[in-house]
Amino acid sequence: MADNDFLSGEAIMVFKKEILDSHSDFTRSLSHQSASPEAYDQENVFSQDFQPFMKQDKETQNSASQPTSEQSLANRDPCTVPDDLREEMMRQRRKEDAFKTALCDAYKRSQACSYGDQCRFAHGVHELRLPMNPRGRNHPKYKTVLCDKFSMTGNCKYGTRCQFIHKIVDGNAAKLASGAHANTSSKSPARNAAAHNHSLFVPQGSTDRSMDLNQSLPIRQSDLVRAFARATRLDVSGYNSTAQLAQYFESQFQRIQQLSSHHH
């Protein structure tokens, strides 16, 4: 019984010694491998390979946690910023609203643009977009409502810049405007010129007082020529007198009437 206990105790001691020796050998082997130049080089190469990814990830986290100054400025309330920053905010918003809302002049001339895809203007009608706050000709209601001043008096001080439709709807007003130059020549030269220009657009003997001319009556002859050139895209530089222009308008009006009668 005692011999068996002694053998068992000796076996346990041997087993413990083997475990300790194995652990010591493993520790020495591990320390030797970690201290070897090859292992150091492998570890260094591994860290260098992953360094760009770690740097990129860090930059991504920083950009996500810290927005750019333009983004933070655009998201701020205009009522809570100083005047200079508010002006910068409005400038950025106007720039963003105007993006691709007009055709590129360089692209229209030569079908090429040095800015390429970075151009703020549209390279073709397919790229055009409506602005966020349309004004002028871009407004959806541009030239959709009659101009009260022009409809009643046949004249408008805004001229071709008027945002409303210039259409004669009152026959009495048209007669008054067409004959005003004979009655008020000594009282108001400006009104006389306006009435005379109006008679150019309303040919004598015409009973159609509702024709849509879609533009006003310039007072000066040069304005009249430019307005007609813009509307028709024709060269009217050869017409040096108002009488020649009146004759030309008369012939154009008759031609339009003939075309409309053929269609009906």
Swiss-Prot record:
One GO molecular-function entry: zinc ion binding
Residue numbers binding Zn(2+) 1: 104, 113, 119, 123
Binding site for Zn(2+) 2: 147, 156, 162, 166
Zinc fingers typed C3H1-type, residue spans: 98-126, 141-169
Gene deletion effect: RNAi-mediated interference leads to maternal-effect lethality. Expression of glp-1 in all four blastomeres including the posterior EMS and P2 blastomeres, instead of only in the ABa and ABp blastomeres at the four-cell stage. Abolished asymmetry in neg-1 expression in AB descendants.
Cellular component annotations (GO), alphabetically ordered: cytoplasm; cytosol; P granule
Compositional bias per record (Polar residues), positions renumbered to this chain: 61-74
Cross-referenced Pfam families: zf-CCCH
Record-level GO BP terms: cell fate specification; embryo development ending in birth or egg hatching; embryonic pattern specification; negative regulation of transcription by RNA polymerase II; regulation of translation
Main location per the UniProt record: cytoplasm
Disordered: annotated span: 56-82
Alphabetical UniProt keywords: Cytoplasm, Developmental protein, Differentiation, Metal-binding, Repeat, RNA-binding, Translation regulation, Zinc, Zinc-finger
InterPro entries linked: ZFP36-like (IPR045877), Znf_CCCH (IPR000571), Znf_CCCH_sf (IPR036855)
Localization terms from the record: Cytoplasm
General function of this protein: RNA-binding protein that coordinates cell fate specification and differentiation during early embryogenesis. Binds to a consensus pos-1 recognition element (PRE) consisting of the sequence 5'-UA(U 2-3)RGD(N 1-3)G-3', where R is any purine, D is A, G, or U, and N is any base. The PRE motif is found within the 3' untranslated region of many maternal transcripts required for early development. Binds to the 3' untranslated region (UTR) of Notch receptor homolog glp-1, thereby repressing glp-1 translation in the posterior blastomeres in the embryo.
Assembly, per entry: Monomer.
Entry protein name: RNA-binding protein pos-1
